[in-house]
Every structure is written in C-alpha cells, then in structure tokens.
C-alpha cells in the first residue's frame, strides 16, 4: 500500500536526517500528523529559523545569531588560548563542561582525501590568518575527534602553525579512539583538557 503523497514526502524528508531509517521516519510522520497544528507550525518554524537566522561567526566559525558570536565578543574570555574543534556541536560540549574559558575555532570538518575533503574545504586558512593577526594567542589546543581523519588534521595544522612559535597541544588520552567529542561525558572532557600534551 502506498501512503498519501504528503505522508510519503514527510517520510522521505525525515529519512534525510542521520540515523533515521524508514521505520522511524514513518513513525515520526504519523506522530506529526496527530500533533496539534500549532505544534506542527512551531516545529516547521524552528526548522526554517535554523536555516535563516543562524550563520557562521566571521571570527571563529561557530554558529551564531550575531556576528561576531557571543564567545568571540566576550571581553572576559582568555584570548591567549584557541581551541580548534571539528564542529559547532563540539563547542557546545566544551562550554557545557564549564572549565575552558578561552576562544574557539571551528573547522567544519576534517581532512579526508578519500572523500575529496582537503584543506580548502574546511576552515583552516581562516585559522592561520586569525593566528597571524592575533598577538595575544599563545597556545592552540587541537581538540579534534580521535579518528584517523582527526589525527591527520591535527598533525597537518600543527605543522602549519608550529613555525610561528605558538604552543600546540592535543587533548590528553581518555577519549577513546574513534569517539566523538560531543558524546564524551563532562569528567572525561575536563581531564582531556587539563592533561593535554604538547605536540
């Protein structure tokens, strides 16, 4: 049996989300159909707002409603330390930890030659330019996921910025190989930042 076109389209739309298969998408579509209209309108507006009202910070690449973002424009933040992360969700993980008070730089990915992702496709060039302009920066913390791509990206960035005389550190062991920062618990993240090692 074929679903009516609006349901079929909604199922297809849900299946575009990561980790959502056909069964889950079907369940969500039928749940949405039973939701009150104002809840559906609010959900749809939230999706539109994410695309229309958020942008990347021109300084660090984090997601923001204002430019520069609240972290970059906060005068209390420690400007001597810049933590480089893969995705904006990693910034949220470190901010929730509540221990790090420096700045961030979001790459929006990692080097992955097999997928055609080189240095030009991620936010590396702006990091180098930022470090050249920022006399206050003394340390760059490479807080990338413990995957082969994360490790190779960290080594690539380290080789680029080491000649400038900046201290380059990597998060301490404790994050399992292949694990994502966003899923690490706060204690593990805290220990990884505190025990970081110099490259």
UniProtKB/Swiss-Prot annotation:
CDD domains (UniProt xref): TOPRIM_recR
Biological processes per GO annotation: DNA recombination; DNA repair
Positions of the Toprim domain: 80-176
UniProt keyword annotations, A-Z: DNA damage, DNA recombination, DNA repair, Metal-binding, Zinc, Zinc-finger
Pfam family for this entry, one: RecR_ZnF
Residues passing through the membrane, by range: none
Annotated GO MF terms: DNA binding; zinc ion binding
Zinc finger (C4-type): 57-72
Superkingdom of the organism of origin: Bacteria
InterPro entries (UniProt xref): DNA_Rcmb_RecR, Rcmb_RecR, Rcmb_RecR_Znf, TOPRIM_dom, TOPRIM_RecR
Gene3D superfamilies tied to this protein: 3.30.60.80, 3.40.1360.10, 6.10.250.240, RecR Domain 1
HAMAP family, sorted: RecR
PANTHER family: RECOMBINATION PROTEIN RECR
Family, similarity comment: Belongs to the RecR family.
Function text: May play a role in DNA repair. It seems to be involved in an RecBC-independent recombinational process of DNA repair. It may act with RecF and RecO.
Protein name: Recombination protein RecR
